[in-house]
Amino acid sequence: MKFVDEVSIRVKAGDGGNGCMSFRREKFIENGGPNGGDGGDGGSVYMVADENLNTLVDYRYTRHHEAQRGANGGSTDCTGKKGEDLFLRVPVGTTVIDASTQEVIGDLVTPGQKLMVAQGGWHGLGNTRFKSSTNRAPRQTTPGKPGDQRDLKMELKVLADVGLLGLPNAGKSTFIRSVSAAKPKVADYPFTTLVPNLGVVSVDRWKSFVIADIPGLIEGASDGAGLGIRFLKHLARTRVLLHLVDLAPLDGSSPADAAEVIINELTRFSPSLTDRERWLVLNKADMLMDDERDERVKEVVERLQWEGPVYVISAIAKQGTEQLTHDLMRYIEDRADRLANDPAYAEELADLDQRIEDEARAQLQALDDARTLRRTGVKSVHDIGDDDAWDDDFEDDEDGPEIIYVRD
């Protein structure tokens, strides 16, 4: 199934049913009182988190969703039937955003969680509601209120405990294959991974955690280059990040330079994401002699001024991976215990999570806006500065012929 993590849809709640104007008419009762019933309320639209879904592909081609309208009121004080609510099932981890205001309506992070995104219209009133001591035969009714209509943007962020960072061909997919039952595609060319992959890592049989692999980052990713920038948001909800570095790149490049590129791009994408717990994992150690391996490890650590945990592994040979997974499991459990017992720590992490979410959304929105400007041919702020510099080189052409470009 195709992986889709961003869609835009329009939802419309049902309108309320109209009130009825009716009077009681029976044998021997010629002038009975009013008995027009109220209309029914319109159906509302809800989002429901479904743990059996992992993509938003169902909403890629079906963009309009409308709940049922409430039935009109009837005679003999019959109230119209309420419109049926519409339940849209989405994967756990979906964020619902109002497209017009960019307001976050809610996050669906637990299975079965419901979120109302459009309120059904209020029912209209029948003429029975307007009778009084001075108005025995009212002919007044009210129509049902229209239901809410909203343009929504839905963003899916996979829920994983551990996220993998690294350049293409750093061995992220090989690592996730070696520690879990996931089987992502592995090849000797860049960008083998095109969509996020999830794997469940079992530790000591009864313990497990989820690990996420996203497409590799390249230099300039924070400006929209490559694939990884669109998927960095999936790491926003992870508990710990593993920064994978290839110790023996095929092109002979410096592992320290590659590690520095990832740090720079991560900082530009979301400064708060760099405050997340990160571990340095140096991969493909089996391809080097011991002296050369130790020298490259030292170079990377010194270049990054790294003070956190460092692991030297070989994912394909499964060297050092078991110790790494056990340490990850221990960290995740200790973190959960501290969250439960330390309110200050829990508040600090909640604030960090919110800052990461806000920065990631702002960065991706800026990239979307820039892409829209390019498609429409409108210059962005950065492009205007470049054109002004270009015009300065041709100030001597003021006396030349004037050329006017007209867009069809």
Curated annotation (Swiss-Prot):
One of its GO terms (cellular component) is cytoplasm. Its EC number is 3.6.5.-. Monomer. Residues 1-159 form the Obg domain. Keywords: Cytoplasm, GTP-binding, Hydrolase, Magnesium, Metal-binding, Nucleotide-binding. It is found in: Cytoplasm. Mg(2+) binds at residues 173, 193. PANTHER family: DEVELOPMENTALLY REGULATED GTP-BINDING PROTEIN-RELATED (PTHR11702), MITOCHONDRIAL RIBOSOME-ASSOCIATED GTPASE 2 (PTHR11702:SF31). Gene3D superfamilies: GTP1/OBG domain (2.70.210.12), P-loop containing nucleotide triphosphate hydrolases (3.40.50.300). Its cofactor is Mg(2+). InterPro entries: G_OBG (IPR031167), GTP-bd (IPR006073), GTP-bd_Obg/CgtA (IPR014100), GTP1-OBG_CS (IPR006074), GTP1_OBG_dom (IPR006169), GTP1_OBG_dom_sf (IPR036726), OBG_GTPase (IPR045086), P-loop_NTPase (IPR027417). An essential GTPase which binds GTP, GDP and possibly (p)ppGpp with moderate affinity, with high nucleotide exchange rates and a fairly low GTP hydrolysis rate. Plays a role in control of the cell cycle, stress response, ribosome biogenesis and in those bacteria that undergo differentiation, in morphogenesis control. Residues 127-149, 378-408 are annotated as: Disordered. Belongs to the TRAFAC class OBG-HflX-like GTPase superfamily. OBG GTPase family. The lineage of its organism: Bacteria, Pseudomonadati, Pseudomonadota, Gammaproteobacteria, Pseudomonadales. This is GTPase Obg. CDD domains: Obg.
